[in-house]
Amino acid sequence: MNKTIITTALLAFSSAAAYANTISLDAVDGNVYQQTVQSPCVFSNPSCTNGGFAATALPTGGGVNGYDAFSPVYTGSTIFSIIGAGNSILLGLDINQASGQPAQTLSAFYMLKNGSVVDTFLFAGTGNVPAGNNGNGYADFLLSNFSSFLSTDTIQFHFVFNNANDGTENVFLIGAPGTPASIPEPTSLALLGSGLLLVAAKFRKKAKI
């Protein structure tokens, strides 16, 4: 099975090389991005909490050498409901690596828009995604620099992973951060306090009359 997956990834090099946009892969320093219902899995293991968001379940139990899988086909509006309208896609990759085992390999990752590949990540070597962050569902790596899309577009992802040596990896959409409640600036608070004092003074004058 491992040989088949590697062959598939290598064949993709020639056909995908013409696409200019390259997906970026960057390590995450610390437990920053965690998979939650607000950041649902696209490729999932049993620990994913997705709510009603569709995902492709990957083989569990560490009994496979790798994966060559396609995500469900999403509408752009479905993606925007997670990441926020007009925002760019950011995916977290949570690595499960067995103790004492070598680093595993992300061989290829693609985004398809309306059925055509528009973004590619390709790696010909091995061991480019060592586990870095402990804890359940935390991203060890980020995939970014995806093409823009419209609400009416369809979006799908293709995930090729090799040298798997532990439990299932997951790939999840990183949701838009929550908007904090508006807090008045100190100057605004001072002006508000002055205004309240003036109102109180007027009421006192009327009471004396």
Which stretches of residues belong to each language-model region?
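Positively charged n-region of N-terminal signal peptides that target proteins for export
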Residues: 1-4, 204-206
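RTX-like calcium-binding, glycine/aspartate-rich low-complexity repeat tracts
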Residues: 2-6, 21-23
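Sec-dependent N-terminal signal peptides
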Residues: 5-14, 194
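Generic secondary-structure boundary signal with a strong preference for alpha-helix termini
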Residues: 14, 202-207
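Sec/Tat signal peptide C-region and signal peptidase I cleavage site
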Residues: 16-20
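Helix-boundary and membrane-interface capping/anchor signal
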Residues: 21-182
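A short, hydrophobic C-terminal helix/tail in secreted or cell-surface proteins
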Residues: 184-202
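Localized chelating/binding microdomains
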Residues: 189, 206-209
